[in-house]
């Protein structure tokens, strides 16, 4: 198998996966569906049923780059029991996985390999960026490390930390499940670039801003 190594441009546009430029393409029967109240309700029920199935059976791809991968695999132990969320079935092939967790440092030489693995995944597919290195390069501000995996992949959920705890990974699964529940994809048997509606999820920092500001008693390191 031949690989082509390409240099990631830190300040360049995401030309391969222009997520922000996606347009929603209407299904040919969409206008007829919305003319009927019954068919409109049926369409909404079908979307909810499909999204419920996708959100409760997320199969991760067994892939890791660095120490964050160890924290990810820890969540599969009996202590955390990630099987409660239907995400315990680790797939060894990207063609059988639903989402990829980029856990670790994305080196420039590894970027085209990660991109190729992402291309081999079938739709619908999602990406979780786990750890400071995957989010922004972390402490490796150097030419050999891509400063954020979102330079060459569309990322759905970011997990901060160096490294994040397994509980943070489980919270990311819940956020991804919530995001999937609000998605709208064409209910068609035709596979193609038909456009996908993704909900604009509020970041956890903004959502908990009022709660953080209201804190008056700061705990010491021994109390945490």
From Swiss-Prot:
It is found in: Cell inner membrane. One of its GO terms (biological process) is electron transport coupled proton transport. [4Fe-4S] cluster binds at residues 67-68, 133, 162. GO terms for molecular function: 4 iron, 4 sulfur cluster binding; iron ion binding; NADH dehydrogenase (ubiquinone) activity; NADH:ubiquinone reductase (non-electrogenic) activity; quinone binding. It is a peripheral membrane protein. Pfam families: Oxidored_q6 (PF01058). It comes from the Bacteria. Keywords: 4Fe-4S, Cell inner membrane, Cell membrane, Iron, Iron-sulfur, Membrane, Metal-binding, NAD, Quinone, Translocase, Transport, Ubiquinone. Its EC number is 7.1.1.-. GO terms for cellular component: plasma membrane; respiratory chain complex I. It is an enzyme of class 7 (translocase). Binds 1 [4Fe-4S] cluster. Its cofactor is [4Fe-4S] cluster. It catalyses: a quinone + NADH + 5 H(+)(in) = a quinol + NAD(+) + 4 H(+)(out). SUPFAM superfamilies: HydA/Nqo6-like. HAMAP family: NDH1_NuoB. Belongs to the complex I 20 kDa subunit family. NDH-1 is composed of 13 different subunits. Subunits NuoB, CD, E, F, and G constitute the peripheral sector of the complex. NCBIfam families: nuoB_fam, PRK06411.1. NDH-1 shuttles electrons from NADH, via FMN and iron-sulfur (Fe-S) centers, to quinones in the respiratory chain. The immediate electron acceptor for the enzyme in this species is believed to be ubiquinone. Couples the redox reaction to proton translocation (for every two electrons transferred, four hydrogen ions are translocated across the cytoplasmic membrane), and thus conserves the redox energy in a proton gradient. This is NADH-quinone oxidoreductase subunit B.
């Amino acid at each position: 198998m031949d690989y082509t190594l390409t240099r990631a441009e830190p300040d360049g546009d995401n030309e391969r996966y222009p997520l922000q430029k996606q347009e929603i393409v209407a299904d040919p029967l969409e206008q007829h569906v919305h003319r009927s109240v019954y068919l409109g309700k049926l369409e909404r029920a079908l979307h909810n049923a499909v999204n419920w199935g996708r959100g409760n059976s997320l199969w991760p791809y067994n892939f890791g780059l660095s120490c964050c991968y160890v924290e990810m695999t820890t969540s599969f132990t009996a202590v955390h029991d990630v099987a409660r969320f239907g995400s315990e079935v680790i797939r060894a092939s990207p063609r059988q996985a639903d989402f990829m967790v980029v856990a670790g440092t994305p080196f420039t030489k590894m970027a085209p390999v990660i991109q190729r693995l992402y291309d081999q995944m079938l739709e619908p597919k999602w990406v979780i960026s786990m750890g400071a290195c995957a989010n922004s390069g972390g402490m490796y501000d150097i030419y050999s490390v891509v400063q954020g995996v979102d330079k060459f992949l569309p990322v759905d959920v970011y997990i901060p930390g160096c490294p994040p705890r397994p509980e943070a990974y489980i919270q990311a699964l819940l956020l991804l499940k919530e995001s999937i529940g609000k998605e709208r994809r064409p209910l068609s048997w035709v596979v193609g670039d038909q456009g996908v509606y993704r909900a604009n999820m509020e970041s956890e920092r903004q959502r908990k801003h009022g709660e953080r500001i209201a804190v008056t008693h700061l705990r010491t390191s021994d109390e945490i």
